[in-house]
Amino acid sequence: MKYTLGKQERLKRRKLIEKLYTEGKSVKNFPLRMMYLQTQHTSDFPCQVGVSVPKRNFKLAVSRNRIKRLLRESYRLQKEIVYNNLEEPYVFMISYIGKEEPVYEEVFLKMQKLLNLFVEKTKEIKNE
């Protein structure tokens, strides 16, 4: 598996993002929240991901961009957790909901836990 986060793996389509926020479900592991939705997207990858940091909590764009870089990097290195356990295509948005700027180690560990929670939820849904 390549540990890259290419253009086709990124969630960019406005309609998909709107549908994700209106119909999607969420999983939380503070300070991260993941909104996810099973869908039929046109990408060759099993999931598309987007990251967001609210302007309300971080006024400076420099801070928001740094946190988004941390989120993308920690997802990129751990995406095999999701790829090895999914059968249907998903789109999801990972949001940082904390109030202070995180350090990378914290984000990495929280992302790992969040991805495992997501996999458990999808397996529960599949078993029902």
Regions found by a protein language model. Give the residues of each.
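Positively charged, solvent-exposed patches that mediate nucleic-acid binding
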Residues: M1-E128
